[in-house]
Amino acid sequence: VLGFQRDDILDYVFNNIKIKPEIAESIVENEDLYLNNATYKLSDTLYEMTGYKNIFALSGSDANEGAIKLASAYQKIIGQNKRTKIVCFENSYHGSTFLNYNMGDSLFEDPLYTMKPYNEVIRLKRDFDPSSVNWDEVMCIMVETCSYGQQLRPNSQDFWDKITQIQHGGVVLILDDIFIGGGKTGTFVGWRNLPVMPDIFTMGKAITAGFFPLSATMYGPKIAEVLP
């Protein structure tokens, strides 16, 4: 998106991460977290491009963990405390932290890092039968825009129809757009051409073209309206 090893970008980043007197003073006095203008500008730009508010993080794993925490907070705020389950799909990859790794598939598993049982995760096949799940217990469903684990083969219209129906039943829909976002599908947001509108979606390397660690958990009006 931005090119490779551009000196102007590297110089801008370097100049902005050098600690400034006001930042040092804020840290010493334990005042509120200091945010520079670039943070606000990027947040505003992403909102203008997507219509979603955001929470910044460092990695895709962080963004996906944040998405699940947002979904959990949303369900609790609206009084749906029984919704604790997380639904994901086979041949998926959502990160390397404990929860996200358990949501992935054995394709990414090795003898030194085996899956641990996590009772809140339900992993389904792509041709799943919706009646096989008690959706009243499900907090959120996480889907990759286009899964690396299934060789980037797009999901079927029938698959997305099921997902939309489940979303309308009160389950928070999270789209993991980290791998495929950033223009790979013809739009900056990878899911724009899909027949679906997520409540939350996540972005990663595409934001900075890999120049430095940054990701974002993007949340729409449904979530924003209930957050304190």
Q: Where do the protein language model's features map onto the residues?
A:
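Conserved N-terminal phosphate-binding loop of PLP-dependent enzymes in the Aspartate aminotransferase
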Residues: 1-228
